[in-house]
Curated annotation (Swiss-Prot):
Binding sites annotated in the UniProt record for Zn(2+) 2: 76, 78, 83
UniProt record similarity statement: Belongs to the small heat shock protein (HSP20) family.
Positions annotated to bind Zn(2+) 1: 55, 76, 78, 83, 91
Residues bearing attached sugar chains per UniProt: 138
Name of the protein: Alpha-crystallin A chain
Zinc is among the record's keywords: yes
Annotated GO MF terms: metal ion binding; structural constituent of eye lens; unfolded protein binding
Subunit composition and interactions: Heteropolymer composed of three CRYAA and one CRYAB subunits. Inter-subunit bridging via zinc ions enhances stability, which is crucial as there is no protein turn over in the lens. Can also form homodimers and homotetramers (dimers of dimers) which serve as the building blocks of homooligomers. Within homooligomers, the zinc-binding motif is created from residues of 3 different molecules. His-76 and Glu-78 from one molecule are ligands of the zinc ion, and His-83 and His-130 residues from additional molecules complete the site with tetrahedral coordination geometry.
Organism in which the protein naturally occurs: Rana temporaria (European common frog)
UniProt lineage: Eukaryota, Metazoa, Chordata, Craniata, Vertebrata
Keywords: Cytoplasm, Eye lens protein, Glycoprotein, Metal-binding, Nucleus, Zinc
């Protein structure tokens, strides 16, 4: 899921990519966070989602809780880049733990484009409220280190 990253010589001429093997592809060796995969951690005390949204600003993102789910939506209008014009949009939906303290949830966007949605868990399993609630996205100045696998 690497959209809008442009094409490279090895994308157009894969037979010129490697002397190691004709089947070797540089594009397959991209880092974890460049893959578009999110990281969800749920331990005893905390629930956290890390998502690479480097092509979006906080104004392009909407994060809201709807019943027992968090919905993350990103969309930006058509922009010019090095390779032409591009627009991007995504939707992600994650089920929240029943014991998540929804009143203490935070959401921030790091300088390197990692969106972190996080909240503490309560000791008792209280019934979550079934309503829609927006979660503001704050901007951080420091980059987020890559999540551990």
């Amino acid at each position: 899921q690497v959209f809008g990253e442009g094409m490279f010589d090895y994308d157009l001429f894969p037979f010129l990519t490697s002397t190691v093997s004709p089947h070797y592809r540089h594009g397959l060796l991209r880092g974890f966070m460049d893959s578009g995969i999110s990281e969800v951690r749920s331990d005893r005390d905390r629930f956290t989602i890390n998502l690479d949204v480097k092509h979006f600003s906080p104004d392009d993102l909407t994060v809201k809780i709807l019943d027992d789910f968090v919905e993350i939506h990103g969309k930006h209008s058509e922009r010019q880049d090095d390779h032409g014009y591009i627009s991007r949009e995504f939707h992600r939906r994650y089920r929240l733990p029943s014991n998540l303290d929804q009143s203490s949830i935070s959401c921030s966007l790091s300088a390197d484009g990692i969106l972190t949605f996080s909240g503490p868990k309560m000791m008792s399993n209280l019934v979550s409220s079934h309503s829609e609630r927006p979660i503001p996205v704050s901007r951080e100045e420091k980059p987020t280190s890559a999540p551990s696998s």
